[in-house]
Amino acid sequence: PNASFSTIVDNEEIMMTMNTIASQKKLEAAVWLDLNNGMNRTGIIPDKEAALLYQKIALSSNLKAKGLHVYDGHIHASDFAVRKEICDRDFDLVLGLKKQIEQLGIQIKTIVAGGTPTFPIHVKRDQVEVCPGTPLLWDQGYADAYKDLKFIPAAVLIGAVVSKPAKNLMCLNLGHKAVAAEMPPPRLKILNFEKLEQISHSEEHIVVACVDSKNYIIG
C-alpha cells in the first residue's frame, strides 16, 4: 500500500495517449521525461523541444510531472577521472535543460540519473536520485573494469564437468541458461582455475581449454 508507481516518456503522442487513458480511469499518472544525453537508446535530446514537452506534461490534466530521467550507460571508461569528466560533461546537457524548463516557470525538483559505472558520481549531486544501471547483482566484468567500485562476490554459480571431448578440452554445464551471452568471452570467472581458457559458449555448455583434462574428473 505504500508503493508508488511512475513511468517515463520521451514522445508527445505517447504522452497524450497516457493522459487520455489516465483521464478515462480517473487517475493521475506520475511521469518522468526520459532524456538521451549520449546513450542513444531511449529518450529525447535535451533541447528546446524537450523543454516544451515537459511543459505539456506539467500542464496536462491527468499527468504529474515528476522530473527528469537520464540513463548514461554509454559511459564506461575504466579510469575514474576520465569517467567523471565524461559524465560531468554529458550531465551539463541535463542541467541546461533543467534551466530551460525552470525559465518556463516550472520547477524541477528531482532528476533521476545514473548507470552502473557513473552512479558514484551522481550520488554526490544535489537534487539527484541515483539509479544504477544494474540495481542488484553485477557480473565479474564490472569488478574487473571498475576497481574503484570495490565490488565483492555476492553469488557463485556451481557447474560440473560433463565431458572431456579431447585431450586438452573440458565441457562444463554453464551455458547461456546460466550465464548471459550478451558480452564477449570470457563471460565468467572460474574460481581457482582462472587460467582455463573459455573456447566456446552455447545454450547449455561452455567449453574450456586446459593443460591436461585428465586431472579433472567428470561430474
Predicted regions and their residues:
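Active-site-proximal beta-alpha core segment in soluble small-molecule metabolic enzymes
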Residues: 1-80
